[in-house]
Amino acid sequence: MMMASKDATSSVDGASGAGQLVPEVNASDPLAMDPVAGSSTAVATAGQVNPIDPWIINNFVQAPQGEFTISPNNTPGDVLFDLSLGPHLNPFLLHLSQMYNGWVGNMRVRIMLAGNAFTAGKIIVSCIPPGFGSHNLTIAQATLFPHVIADVRTLDPIEVPLEDVRNVLFHNNDRNQQTMRLVCMLYTPLRTGGGTGDSFVVAGRVMTCPSPDFNFLFLVPPTVEQKTRPFTLPNLPLSSLSNSRAPLPISSMGISPDNVQSVQFQNGRCTLDGRLVGTTPVSLSHVAKIRGTSNGTVINLTELDGTPFHPFEGPAPIGFPDLGGCDWHINMTQFGHSSQTQYDVDTTPDTFVPHLGSIQANGIGSGNYVGVLSWISPPSHPSGSQVDLWKIPNYGSSITEATHLAPSVYPPGFGEVLVFFMSKMPGPGAYNLPCLLPQEYISHLASEQAPTVGEAALLHYVDPDTGRNLGEFKAYPDGFLTCVPNGASSGPQQLPINGVFVFVSWVSRFYQLKPVGTASSARGRLGLRR
């Protein structure tokens, strides 16, 4: 079978014009694999086998997290997708699996590449049996298993049988059993035919359908249906959102490989399923606030609602400022008094131990106080130090586990950088305060608590006035965003802050993002119009 358009013109010598650009390979024959017994071996023990609608067996549909891209940033050996055999590979089977306790059988997989004649490169698709780890797989090891090597210019779908190799009679839905895995890796890097210019990004999709021997076992008694909340983000422009480390409006979005790419902020930390981490509060009114009782020397911290703070249960009370590398200037109000007084807090001495529930404020008297961070200045100790808002203060213990600090985050994807939301922090210098998520996103996620059903959420940053997609972003379950900077520009990239982040779909963590500024237009009316 010619991997070229059938209506392409022929040259003088009779060769197909498209065939001169597209490699001639034969993908009509399926990958040679010995057949594996399907549901027949489970009939004797299951007592019942429930056949599937023929339409589902005869039609390929896109697998959840079945989108992938190949870009010039990828290198040979990079994993493009890693999928395991199971009902979750097909949306219809995933829906039906909720009605049964077990499943058994093989599946058929088609890989479709949206390549072109201007970019060349090869991928290798391997079927990895259970028991072999796919995380540290090399290209050489991948060729040991049933595999197919295809050019990204291939026009016809690549069909691969995914056999149910197992050491049990059938699989239980409530057990995490190892199954056959389909792993796709970059075999040779992308390159252009002319030798100059950047290669195009090649997109691909994974389509699946069950084999005729795929069946479900053991019907589950019906229960009251519970509606699952879909994952969403606030439909608000970035210019109307607030910083989650200080009560300040967002002034810009920081996209630059020059920024710090591993941070451990304790405020502004929330997982995509709504779990608060560190000292993050739900409400903006609790951000960068302190409450406690002073004896004239130290302030014994309490929670903002007045309940006692229990040392060793967290790094500090909820909402406690997490700005390190600076001195704090806090406007304090004593309960029972109408006046407000500003006190200075040095975050470097040994008396600063919020993990143990106490800090020291210069010149404060006895009483019950509540305060909010007003502005910052360079740290008093050591003398001559500069403000560094990428750091967090020393909470009073060098043992991370003892203080229950929120873990550090870093960009896990190929060529990705962390996305920071910046605000102008008051002080004697031009200080940009970064945070990982706007506070309104944290309130929304904590309220919705929508389950994460993928390894990353694909987001589009859309201009609500024009509908143009300004860039692709990924939101990871730990609660941070990443993107791929445009290599054509140097230094930090600036995007307008009137855009809206829109959830598109769940994707694999291997999904390769398009560089910022190269995405296509978005569809539909999204965001608020101003």
UniProtKB/Swiss-Prot annotation:
Report the protein name in the record: Capsid protein VP1
Region described as Disordered: 1-20
> Which portions of the sequence form the region P1 sub-domain 1?
226-278
Annotated site residue numbers, Cleavage: 227-228
One GO cellular component assignment for this chain's record is:
host cell cytoplasm
Keyword tags: Capsid protein, Host cytoplasm, T=3 icosahedral capsid protein, Virion
Species of origin: Norovirus (strain Human/NoV/United States/Norwalk/1968/GI) (Hu/NV/NV/1968/US)
Task: Give the family per the record.
Answer: Belongs to the caliciviridae capsid protein family.
Which parts of the sequence are annotated with region: P2 sub-domain? 279-405
Segments of this protein annotated with the region Protruding domain: 226-530
Segments of this protein annotated with the region Plays a role in binding to host histo-blood group structures antigens and in the formation of P-particles: 523-530
| CDD domains tied to this protein | rhv_like
Alphabetized Pfam families for the sequence: Calici_coat, Calici_coat_C
Instruction: Cite the GO molecular-function annotations of the record.
Output: identical protein binding
Q: Where is this region: Shell domain?
A: 1-225
Instruction: Report residue spans for region: P1 sub-domain 2.
Output: 406-530
